Amino acid sequence: MKRSTRKQQGFTLLEMMLVVLLAGIAAGMVVMAFPPERQNDSAWQLARFQAQLEFAAESSQVNEYMLGVRIYPDRWQFYQLQRPAASERIPIPSGDRWQGYKWQPWQPHRVSASATLPEALRLELLQADGKKVDKTQSGDDPDILILPGGEITPFRLLVKSENKALSNWLQVDNTGRFVTSMSQGKKR
C-alpha cells in the first residue's frame, strides 16, 4: 500500500475543537473563582466609605483644601469648599463668614467621590458619643468636615442592613482614629 507523501499543514478540526473546549473549561474555572457580589454587604460598603474618607483626608492635607461629606439615608457625597467660578460670582454679603465660598461636589482624579447603596442597606450618622446628629443645620453644609490639617469631625456611621446582625459601623474619634465594628467584634 502506498502512503501519501504529502505533508500535513495546519490543525485538524478535532484538534481545534479540543483547544476551544480546554479554553472554555479554563475560563469557567476562573469565573467560579471570582468573589460573590458584595454590593449588599454592609462590611464591604463600610470599607469602601472608609477608603474614600482616608483618601479624602490625605488629599485634603496634600492639596490644602477643605472637604466635607454629606450623609443621606441611601448614599454619601464628598464636597469641596470652593469659590464660585468668575462667571457665576454673586455679590457677597458683608457678614458672610465664608466670603463667597460654596460647597461644590468634589471631583478627584480617577476616584469616585460618592456612592449609592442598594435598597437593602441604609446609612445613619451619629455623633461620636452615639447621639443623633441634628440635621436642622443649613442644607448646604456637610455633616462631616475634613480639614487641611488632618482633622476630621468625630462621628459614628451606621450601615444598617435589613438583617440587623449584618449591620456594621465606622467611628472616627476626636484624635482621628478609625474604629470599625469588624475590628471591635461588633460591640456597640
Curated annotation (Swiss-Prot):
Oligomer status and interactors: Type II secretion is composed of four main components: the outer membrane complex, the inner membrane complex, the cytoplasmic secretion ATPase and the periplasm-spanning pseudopilus. Interacts with core component OutG.
Modified sites of kind N-methylphenylalanine: F11
Family the entry assigns: Belongs to the GSP H family.
Gene field: outH
Keyword Transport: yes
Membrane spanning stretches: 13-35
Name assigned to this protein: Type II secretion system protein H
Protein species of origin: Pectobacterium carotovorum subsp. carotovorum (Erwinia carotovora subsp. carotovora)
One cellular component (GO) term of this entry: type II protein secretion system complex
Post-translational changes noted in the entry: Cleaved by prepilin peptidase. Methylated by prepilin peptidase at the amino group of the N-terminal phenylalanine once the leader sequence is cleaved by prepilin peptidase.
Subcellular location, principal: membrane
Record flagged with keyword Glycosyltransferase: no
Organism phylogeny: Bacteria, Pseudomonadati, Pseudomonadota, Gammaproteobacteria, Enterobacterales
Function: Component of the type II secretion system required for the energy-dependent secretion of extracellular factors such as proteases and toxins from the periplasm. Part of the pseudopilus tip complex that is critical for the recognition and binding of secretion substrates.
Propiece residues: 1-10
